[in-house]
Structures are given as structure tokens and as C-alpha cells.
Amino acid sequence: MNKLVIAILFFVLTLGVYAQKKDFYGSNFTVKYPANFTAEGSMPSANNDDTFVSAIFTSPDKKVSFYIYSPNTPALPTDITIKEGFGVPLASSGKKKSKNKVYATSFYEPKDGFTHSYLITCDENDRVTKVVGRRYKTIKDLNASDKLYDEFKKSFQNRKIRK
């Protein structure tokens, strides 16, 4: 009986931790990430204001990381590797009149042993305005993180309007 109560309590507490979110405030964006992940600013803002234009959020077991990049001015990130010639637009994003394009790139098992996958959003002049992605060890890790990753992507909010 005690083992059952302990197991149920552990499940409920674990579920609560996974459901909780924290906010990360970047230079010009906010994103919600799982409370049990570790957040680390990656690429400093050029504004010299102790903020970041990109961040990495790593799971407690270090098998999955989420990535977000939202530059102050459109440009490629320099803190990750983006495969050159990243491809054909996947879909239009935003309002019907928007000319933003979403591109995809991914590369498998570089030297670090993770699979990396990124969605790159570009403006009408093909300048990068946002990159969101993740890296993972195995397909099992990928599948286990799907819901959290979808919530992470949907939580992105741009706080400044780019010129």
C-alpha cells in the first residue's frame, strides 16, 4: 500500500513539474520553457544590455535541447551551424499578406552525436528573422519531447517590431 501511495505521489509531482513553465526574456523576445529544463543565454545582444538574441534550453537528462534565435536585425545565428542553402519555403507564416517564409534545415549526427533540426523564418528579402530548433540523442528522445517542443514553439512572442 505504501509503495502504491509513493508511486502515485511521485507520478503526480513529476507531472506537475513537467506541466510548469518558466519565462525566458531575450533581447527582443519571450519564450516559455519547461521548468525542469536549464536555460542558458547563448548569443549576446549587440545592444550591450546583458540580454541574448538566442538561448538553449536543456532537459535534465541532457538528451534534448530546444533552441531559439530572434535577432535584433535580420541575420543568421553564429552560435549554431546552419546548413548552407537551407532550401525551399515550407509555408507562409503569419497573416495572409505576410511575405515571411519558413525554411527547414536539419543535419544528422554531427560530431556531438545529436541530431539537430531547425526551422528558419525569413522575411520577404530572405533575411533570417527567427530560428527555432532542437537537438536530440535518439528518436525515442525526439518523440518524448514532441509535446513540450510544440508548446515551446507556440509560446514565442516577439517583443519589438523590426524595421
Q: Where in the sequence are the language-model features?
A:
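Residue-level marker for the onset of beta-strands and adjacent loop->beta junctions
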Residues: Q20, S27, V53, A91, ...
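Sec-dependent N-terminal signal peptides
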Residues: L4-L15, A19
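Signature of long, low-cysteine stretches enriched in small and polar/charged residues
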Residues: T78-T129, Y136-I139
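Secretory pathway targeting signatures of secreted, lumenal, and periplasmic proteins
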Residues: Y25-S27, K32-L76, Y108-P110
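Surface-exposed amphipathic alpha-helical segments
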Residues: Q20, F37-T38, K130-K163
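A short, polar/proline- and glycine-enriched secondary-structure boundary/capping micro-motif
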Residues: S42-P44, L76-T81, K140-A144
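Short, hydrophobic/aromatic-rich segments at coil-to-beta transitions
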Residues: A19-K22, T51-S54, K97-F107
